[in-house]
C-alpha cells in the first residue's frame, strides 16, 4: 500500500455529506429538512445531501452548487458529487513519488512528543501547514535514535502573501503577534530534545518591519534556553529592506535560509508580486557580505513549474555568485486544486544531475531529489558537520591567539 504526496482522493459524496452534516448540526432549519426521515435509514446521508443541495440553490446565499460549499477532490468534476463514478482528470503520480505508509508512525515516542508539544503551546509547523510529504520521516526520525527535525513556523498561521504554489493560509490582516511566542517556541524546542531545529515564518507585510524584530527575539530566546542547539532560520525578504535582513544575520543563527523558489522567468507567475528573483538574490548576497562570509546561507529551487534546463543551471550560478553555501532541489507537487498545476515530473536521474552540477559549482552542500524540501532532514547531517568544522576552526584560531598573547606577556 502506498501513500502519495498528492491530495487524498475520498468519496465526494462522503466528503460533501460530512460537511453538510456539520452545518446541519448548527442549523435548526436545516435539521428540519430531515424531519420525515428515520436516521437509521441506510439512505439517510444521500437523502440529506440531495435536500441540502436544493436548499442551497433555493436560498439567496450565492452558493448554487456543492462545489461552492465543499472542496472536491482533485480531478473530480462538480457533477461527480452526486452518485456515480468518479472521473479522474489529473495525471497519476510516477512510481518514485509514491511513499510507503510508515508502520506505527503515530506510536513513535519522538513523533508524538513533537506533535504534542506543538499542540499544547498552540504553535504552527510548516510541516503541517504546507502539507509536507516528509513529516513522518522528519518528526519520527529514521528510527527513534536518529535525528528528528521539525520546522516551527512563527508569527501565526496566516501569511500576507499569496504565492501560487503554497498551501499556507493567506490574509491581508492576520491576527496580532503573540508576545509570548518566543518563550513558547524556546520551551517547545527544549522539550523536543533535538540538536538541530529549523524556524520559518509567514510573511507579515502588515507590520512595519515585516516581523523582523519578533523573529530576532525568537532566535535569541531559543538560543538562551538551548545554547548548544544548531538553529536554522528560513525567512522572508522583509520588503527588501537590507537593514532588517542584516538585523537577523547578526543573531546567533547557524544557517540563514531564504528560498528563491524557482527560475527567474516564471517568478511573476509562481510567487507573490511583492517577491522577486533579484530581491531574493540581494537578500542572500547581503547576508554573506554583512557577516564576512561567516554565516552559512541556504536556498531552495522547485522543479516542475515550467522551467527549462538552462534556466535551472543559471539559477544555481546566480545563487553561488550571491555566496549561497547550500542548496536544495525538489519536485513541486500541487497542494490543492486552487494552486498551480504541475507542468512535469522530473525523473530522479535529473535530480542526481543537478546535485553533481551544484557541487561542481562550489556549493558546500546540495540535497536534490523528488521528495526533497528546503528543510528536509537528510541535509542537516552534512550541514551539522560543516558547522562543527567551522566552530572547531574558530575555536582553534581563538586558542592560537590566546596562546600567542600569553607567550608575548611572558616574554615582556
From Swiss-Prot:
**Ligase found in the keyword field:** no
Q: Which Gene3D superfamilies match?
A: Aldolase class I
| Residues holding [4Fe-4S] cluster 1 | 127, 132, 138, 375
Q: Name any one GO molecular function.
A: lipoate synthase activity
Question: SMART domains, alphabetically?
Answer: Elp3
| Reactions the enzyme catalyzes | [[Fe-S] cluster scaffold protein carrying a second [4Fe-4S](2+) cluster] + N(6)-octanoyl-L-lysyl-[protein] + 2 oxidized [2Fe-2S]-[ferredoxin] + 2 S-adenosyl-L-methionine + 4 H(+) = [[Fe-S] cluster scaffold protein] + N(6)-[(R)-dihydrolipoyl]-L-lysyl-[protein] + 4 Fe(3+) + 2 hydrogen sulfide + 2 5'-deoxyadenosine + 2 L-methionine + 2 reduced [2Fe-2S]-[ferredoxin]
Write down how the cofactor binds this protein: Binds 2 [4Fe-4S] clusters per subunit. One cluster is coordinated with 3 cysteines and an exchangeable S-adenosyl-L-methionine.
The enzyme's first-digit EC class, named in words, is transferase
InterPro entries tied to this protein: Aldolase_TIM (IPR013785), Elp3/MiaA/NifB-like_rSAM (IPR006638), LIAS_N (IPR031691), Lipoyl_synth (IPR003698), rSAM (IPR007197)
Its pathway, per UniProt, is: Protein modification; protein lipoylation via endogenous pathway; protein N(6)-(lipoyl)lysine from octanoyl-[acyl-carrier-protein]: step 2/2
Where along this sequence does the record place binding of [4Fe-4S] cluster 2?
159, 163, 166
Q: Does the keyword Repeat apply?
A: no
A Pfam family that the UniProt record links to this protein: Radical_SAM
Where would I find the Radical SAM core domain in this sequence?
142-364
One GO cellular component term of this record is: mitochondrion
What EC number(s) are associated with this protein in UniProt?
Answer: 2.8.1.8
Needs which cofactor?
[4Fe-4S] cluster
- What transmembrane ranges does the database entry give? none
Where, subcellularly, is it found? Mitochondrion
What UniProt keywords are attached to this protein's entry?
A: 4Fe-4S, Iron, Iron-sulfur, Metal-binding, Mitochondrion, S-adenosyl-L-methionine, Transferase
What more does the entry say? This protein may be expected to contain an N-terminal transit peptide but none has been predicted.
Q: Which PANTHER family match?
A: LIPOYL SYNTHASE, LIPOYL SYNTHASE, MITOCHONDRIAL
Family membership, please give it. Answer: Belongs to the radical SAM superfamily. Lipoyl synthase family.
Protein name per UniProt: Lipoyl synthase, mitochondrial
| Natural source organism | Leishmania infantum
What are the leading ranks of the lineage?
Answer: Eukaryota, Discoba, Euglenozoa, Kinetoplastea, Metakinetoplastina
